[in-house]
Structure formats: structure tokens, C-alpha cells
Amino acid sequence: MVEKEEAGGGISEEEAAQYDRQIRLWGLEAQKRLRASQVLLVGMKGLGAEIAKNLILAGVKGLTMLDHEQVSPEDPGAQFLIRTGSVGRNRAEASLERAQNLNPMVDVKVDTENIEKKPESFFTQFDAVCLTCCSRDVIVKVDQICHKNSIKFFTGDVFGYHGYTFANLGEHEFVEEKTKVAKVSQGVEDGPDTKRAKLDSSETTMVKKKVVFCSVKEALEVDWSSDKAKAALKRTTPDYFLLQVLLKFRTDKGRDPSSDTFGEDSELLLQIRNDVLDALGVNPDLLPEDFVRYCFSEMAPVCAVVGGILAQEIVKALSQRDPPHNNFFFFDGMKGNGIVECLGPN
């Protein structure tokens, strides 16, 4: 009997059983790429927990959870990896036990140092880096490091009912499965002289493609003054501008909007909205004032959706299967829908 490890080219019998459904879904080669991938996940709040869960279950080789913050009283509301009574512990350390139990085959590690103190050499051990809960300056800096070292970069956050993801994969090559269309002439059903296209779901072909991404800095600094940009502005989701406002709030206050200081934070958010959108050269009314009612705290259902999307994009990028989101994904929990936006210099 041939061992599955030999037949699978590096996938053991135990792994073949564990990842059987995924191997059937996206193929053995894609799963082997996942099993060889190291991922850094920064920020272990509610969104980070969802991303960690999905990546661990997908079967990456290793996941490093980095967070220098302590568990707050409100964290367990959306962070299911943290046990009750963990307030005051480091968030990453408090998440380790449950995270590792999800899949013992994945090497789950913890890092409690501030991401801002990490040298460039730290990031080169990873195939993909995903940031949550980070300032705009950190996001831009790490994205530049990842681009320089050909590391796949992702970032995302959840603010109340709203969430976003962003990816910079540089020049990314992937394969997409396409169903063959067979030309059938003289179809009996349609008459002897009729030609029709018949979709044969049993025949598929793998098509290689390439897509080029821009940096997060370029995506956040779109020049809206050109005629082309003004035309695109009408189709751009307000959530893009909401993200700009919330990242500026995080930079100015060193935290996200808090329900404990709702009145004060709401006033500041409106002022930041006016300043940020004026600086971008767009009308502040593009982001209606009632946005302040829906962007406080992390909501578990929104974390689940955005975390699922972000983890899926990481898996797709590492496995080089299927078209990636280029480059933003915005989720509006009030409307219950999401949209992919490609924003940048072009």
C-alpha cells in the first residue's frame, strides 16, 4: 500500500484526513502551499480572533499572534479565544490555548512586543503579514517593508457596524479554474441547423493570470481633483472616507472611538470628517453626519464577516488560487452588504 505522505508529495496521512475537504475544494498543490506558509497576525481583538481561527483551521504551517496590549473588560464581547477572567493578561497570550486547540497541526506562537519596535528583519520570516488595530503610520510602514521583501500584506479593522480589508500583493500570479464552453452544432433540441454554446460543467481548465497592486499609502492618498477621479467619486463608497476619518481619530487619540465617551468622540469625529475630506478635496457631505452612530466598538457579527473575508483573501494569496480582492473590501453591517473597490493612483 502506498503511503499517503508519498502520494501526496509532502502531505501526511493525518493531514490528508484533516484537510480532505479543502484538498477537494482547491486542490493538493494549493494545500501544500498553505502548509508551507508562515503568517504574522497583529492585533488580537475580535477581528484578530476571527482571522486566527480561520487561518488555523485552513492549515497554514505557522501563525504568530502579536499583541502588546492587555485584555480589557469589553474585549470578550467579540473575542471568543479569550477565557473569562483574563482581564489584565496580554491579549495574545490569553488567546493562545484556545487558538492552538483549534488545530494541533499548526504551530501557533505568541509575541508580546509592540509592532512599532520590530526591525525590518523581523518581518522577513513570514510569507504574509496581516495588521489589525494599527495606526495609519504603522500600516504604511509595514506595507512598505512587505513590498520591499515580497511579503504579502493585508490590513483590516472593524468599527461598529463597519469593517474593511486591504491587500497589497505586489505582482501576484494565480490560477483560476474556468469551465470549458463547447460548441455544439446541429443540436437536436433546437433544429438541425442551429448552433449553440453548451456549458459542460465536467470539463474545466486552469488559467494563469497576474494582477498588480498599489501600496496602501497610494490607496489612501488618491488625488480627487482630476476629472477621472471626480467621475469615479460618484461611484466610491462613503466607507472609504469613513476609514480615513477613523484612522485619523486613532492617530490623534491613540485609541478608537469609545462608547464611554460617546458625546465627546462624536463631536471630534465630525470635526475630523470636515478636516480630512476638505484636505482630500471632496465635499464633507459625502459622509453623512449620522455615521457617528454606527462606528463605535467592535461588533461580533461584523468581526465574523470581515474576519472571514480577510482570512479567505490570505488563503487565496498563499495558495495562489482564484482572483484576489484588489484592493479594498468594505462591509456595511447596517445594509448587510460588502463591496470591493480598487482605489489608487490609476
UniProtKB/Swiss-Prot annotation:
Coiled coil: none
N-acetylmethionine: residues bearing it: M1
Gene Ontology annotations for the cellular component aspect, listed alphabetically: cytoplasm; SUMO activating enzyme complex
Entry annotated with the keyword Phosphoprotein: yes
Pathway terms, separated by semicolons: Protein modification; protein sumoylation
Main location, first listed in the record: nucleus
InterPro entries (alphabetical): ThiF/MoeB/HesA (IPR045886), ThiF_NAD_FAD-bd (IPR000594), Ubiquitin-activating_enz (IPR035985), UBQ/SUMO-activ_enz_E1-like (IPR000011)
Subcellular location: Nucleus
Keyword Phosphoprotein (UniProt): yes
Residue positions, PTM N6-acetyllysine: K198
Family: Belongs to the ubiquitin-activating E1 family.
Functional description taken from the UniProt entry: The heterodimer acts as an E1 ligase for SUMO1, SUMO2, SUMO3, and probably SUMO4. It mediates ATP-dependent activation of SUMO proteins followed by formation of a thioester bond between a SUMO protein and a conserved active site cysteine residue on UBA2/SAE2.
Protein name as catalogued: SUMO-activating enzyme subunit 1
